[in-house]
Amino acid sequence: MAQGEVVVKICGRATFACGADLKRLLGELRGRGWQRFTFDLTGCPLMDSTFLGILAGFGMKVSEAKGRKATLLNPSSKIVDLLDNLGVGHLFETQQGTTALADQCQPVELSGPPASKAETTRTALEAHETLMAIEPSNAPKFKDVIRFLAEDLNKLEPPSPPSP
């Protein structure tokens, strides 16, 4: 494996249910010094907007910090359409084929407990806000989702009372 390069293999449907764990994993990997990221989507037929929002936010951070884009390896045509429709395709390099790094992937255990419902909801809210910040034309698509998630989060984490 090249120094500072990591492959994150996404298997199955990439949805909000695993979004908080993905966000935590990516934070841990960056914290360990990994700088170049390839997301192997060979085994990922579908991706929802929450998962894409997390990837887009991460792709933006990596690009701004290191001046290079994260790579999406073998995205399906549905994922490419989603990237284009939500205006975030420019944040990534896309590549078809194989890479030696992807063949060397090994499972990694996340530290800490699984994400709570509140953390999952907060992650979904932030992901959709990211998609709207990157591409303002996404606002009409996600305004109701944002409202619903914010209301749900307020029920899960009521605001703390002001300090005396």
Describe every region a protein language model picked out.
Residues 46:
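Residues immediately C-terminal
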Residues 55-59:
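Histidine-anchored nucleotide/phosphate-binding helix
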Residues 1-43, 60-164:
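STAS-like cytosolic regulatory interaction modules
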